[in-house]
Amino acid sequence: VEPLKHRVDRFFLLTQNGTDIPTEIRAGLVTFLTASYIIFVQPAVLSETGMDFGAVMTATCLSAALGCLIMGLWANYPIALAPGMGINFYFAYTVVIGQGISWQTALGAVFCSGLILIVLTLLRVRALILNLIPDFLKSGIAAGIGLFIAFIGFVQGGLVVENPGTLVKLGNLKSLPVIFTLSGLVLIGVLLQRKIKGAILIGMVLLTLLGLPFGLVTYQGLVSMPPDMGPTLMQMDIAGAFDLGLITVVLVFVFVDLFDTAGTLVGVSQQAGFMEHGKLPRATRAFLPDAVATTAGAAMGTSTVVCYIESSTGVAEGGRTGLTAVVVAVLFLLALFLSPIAQMIGGGYTPEMGKTLYPITAPVLIIVGCLMASNLTRIDWGKWDEALPAFLTFVGMPLTYSIADGMALGFITYPVLKICSGKSVHPVMILIAVLFLLRYVMLGD
């Protein structure tokens, strides 16, 4: 046992990164539990196009596991991957249902976008973009992701609800899910203040146990057999994806993945302290997992795979190496057989005729958003040519409900303000701003 422990330590550089095996396992478990909703949401969304629910669920778990394994073993970062939220709705409701394109052809477009991302990664284009982002924008991105996931936590916990007049309003503080969300915030906050190891995981476990007698968590067994992936396996229509009318669809898949992943890498890396002089070590390796997993995922039967912002929950739990990502990969594979347990914690609670809420995981997202807000202190608020782009990035992510769109606000205003102030801007950053503008002018929403 001891030699194996040393080999794991050397491979993942655990001691060098100030962590250990138990910490990494806890971090992986927390990350998985906060991201496990995708196991059930993804097939629910894609099945609207006629795709088989069970096959998509299996493809989702396998593509997520593949991406996490590559991230952990190749890049050695504690970042989880899975099919992305947002882009899956674009796949289902805009491309397939809205444009009348078959889901097979849409998968072909995802497959082609994955190949393009692999090429861009190997040519180091993606790493170049990441390392050229100024430090103040990196801080704005990290804080913006924190605010974004905190807002998601507020929504999933029922603390804020839709309101036609004011967009959002305070939720019903007397409802049981909201009370549980607030209780979870206090519980995890106290555990963190007392510096209890595994505070976030302990909080989630206690909330789950407390939720059982109140009906917020439903025990549905322990083991289930994985669904057959046959109905979607290798069903993508690559030839159809080369149709002239689908070029914009492929480009949207590429664009969203490119900047969503870049934003997540920046945010999580800032939080974990990975950045060295404004650059991310092993950036090219960190960009390969989502590209490969997207390509493989399309072949299996699911939409674009991205780096998950929920990875920040694992970092908050102490995860600092790829071992965290490997643990997440193993859990996604186990979820094929233990989906009832994953659904018990991450599947949410749906009251009669109501919206599904997630009172177990929502407090975790809000807590992590609080932790990531510390990046705002790194911005020089006295320099308007830096403060305004960072601020627009920060507030843009939750208000547009998109990491990529929030980044666009900052990336477009940054070179404009700098140039108008008589300062120089790297040509690549100007090109990115132009591409963002063209993306909205030519490709639409």
Locations of regions flagged by a protein language model:
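Hydrophobic/aromatic residues within the transmembrane alpha-helices of Major Facilitator Superfamily
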Residues: 29-36, 66-69, 73, 150, ...
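Membrane-embedded alpha-helical modules
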Residues: 99-213, 326-445
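Helix-loop-helix junctions within the multi-pass membrane cores of secondary transporters/permeases
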Residues: 3-42, 63, 84-93, 97-142, ...
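Juxtamembrane transmembrane-helix boundary signature
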Residues: 64-85
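Residue-level signature of catalytic and energy-coupling elements of molecular machines
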Residues: 25, 45, 129, 198, ...
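Helix-loop-helix hairpins and the membrane-proximal interhelical loops
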Residues: 1-55, 168-171, 201-284, 437-438
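Loop-to-helix transition at the N-terminal end of transmembrane alpha-helices
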Residues: 50-69
